[in-house]
């Protein structure tokens, strides 16, 4: 998907992680600043939305700024590199990306806050669609433990996935 649809050659670690997310339910990536973690997450989100239908992709991070100004802007950048047919299928809003003709398929941004961990409750996948519920966690080291505990309940759906990236602390 990344090489064909986005016309990019991933770094070795990104390629390995892309293969891992296709075959494993959970992956975590720890690395320093500026190595392409947010680009990687953008690729994963677009891949899930366009290849797993229906698909729900709740995305969280330690701050609204990280979600809106970093992850969402990176997603928009990479979406512009998709073939025109795929681009036309995506609707971008400030905190949500939807597929035009499949209302059950979306990615949504929810800030991870200790005082409102329930923001990640209520998501359910489709058991016969691998990856139909996929949690994306940006800057995972800054996300409070209670948020992970709340999200864990939804991960009982067969085929659900979790992708976490962050800097080691």
In which residue ranges do the predicted regions lie?
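Phosphate/NTP-binding elements of NTP-utilizing enzymes
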Residues: 1-169
